[in-house]
Structures are given as structure tokens and as C-alpha cells.
Amino acid sequence: MAEQTTLARPYAKAVFELTKDAKTRNTWSKRLQALGTVAADDQVAALVGNPRVSREQLIGLLLDAVGEDTLGQEGKNLVQLLADNGRLGLLPEIAALYEHLRAEAEGVVDVQVTSASKLTKEQQDQIAGALKKRLGRKVRLHCRTDEALIGGALIQAGDLTIDGSVRGKLARLSSAMAH
């Protein structure tokens, strides 16, 4: 995973440096998300790694699946470049890194909130408000549930992790009692 990130980062940065305004960033987000989704498909990933499938066939497959209108000439150029360098398998990682760069530039932090039960809109707003105040940036919440947490929530924003789950509290209590 770390190796893929290292290989994908220069491509994501290069694409990001092409974008000068929000409209262009949004266009590239759509392009990269579409390409990343197609490239992440198990069947497509198997073809990308198959030496019997030519570079031209892979390019054609991606262009057909995503649509040349969606990609535009710059998107086609990226696909060609990645194919030439044997890096089409990096598309999902490139898309993720691009979104991270975009969020940073726009002063937004993506936050993963995992809770034991579904959060209400009011709870989501309360968490977002508290995190915005603490981090000093706009917050974009991504919520999911995991009943294994028993209660509470686990919040992850970049390197920051706040474990307010019952499972986490029990683990810390158990660890403290063992020492």
C-alpha cells in the first residue's frame, strides 16, 4: 500500500497542479473517480495485470468504460501516460490522493465517524461543529455504523483519532488493570 502511494503521488500532484479553479478541480475529481472506480473493479484489475492484454486494449477498455466525453483530451492523455508507464493499476490510489490534495487546498478535512448506531442529523452537525472548532477547517463527515463498538463513536480525521467508543474504553480499562 505504501509503495502504491509513493508511486501514485507524483501523478496526483501533477494533475492537481493542472487545476487552477474549483470548476477544473471538480472536473478532474469526476474524471479520476470514474477512472479509479473502473480500475478498481476485480475484472479490470485482472486485465491490467495480464501480460496478454495489450496497452492499447487497456486504454480502449478504460476510455469505453468511462466515456471519452467524461475524460476529455487531458484525461485521455493521463490514461495514455499511465499505460505507457505500466501504472494503470494506480488509478484508485491516484484518485484518493488527488481528493486529499483538493481537500487540503480548499481547507476541508475528511472525517470518518464510526458509531455503534446510526447518527441523527443533529448529532452529525454537533460532531462537525466541534471538529471544525478544534481543527480550524471545514469538516466533511463520512458516517458508518459498527455494532462491535457497543456504544459511542470512533472519529478519525487524518492523523487524529478520537476513540469515544465503549469498546475502546473497555480496552483502555483492561490495559490499565493489567499494568
Swiss-Prot record:
Location in or out of the cell: Cell inner membrane
Membrane topology: Peripheral membrane protein
Short name of one Pfam family: OSCP
Lineage: superkingdom: Bacteria
Gene Ontology cellular-component terms listed: plasma membrane; proton-transporting ATP synthase complex
PROSITE patterns in the record: ATPASE_DELTA
Chief subcellular location: membrane
Function description: F(1)F(0) ATP synthase produces ATP from ADP in the presence of a proton or sodium gradient. F-type ATPases consist of two structural domains, F(1) containing the extramembraneous catalytic core and F(0) containing the membrane proton channel, linked together by a central stalk and a peripheral stalk. During catalysis, ATP synthesis in the catalytic domain of F(1) is coupled via a rotary mechanism of the central stalk subunits to proton translocation.
Database matches in NCBIfam families: ATP_synt_delta (TIGR01145), PRK05758.2-2 (NF004402)
HAMAP family tied to this protein: ATP_synth_delta_bact
Subunit structure: F-type ATPases have 2 components, F(1) - the catalytic core - and F(0) - the membrane proton channel. F(1) has five subunits: alpha(3), beta(3), gamma(1), delta(1), epsilon(1). F(0) has three main subunits: a(1), b(2) and c(10-14). The alpha and beta chains form an alternating ring which encloses part of the gamma chain. F(1) is attached to F(0) by a central stalk formed by the gamma and epsilon chains, while a peripheral stalk is formed by the delta and b chains.
Protein name: ATP synthase subunit delta
Source taxonomy: Bacteria, Pseudomonadati, Pseudomonadota, Gammaproteobacteria, Chromatiales
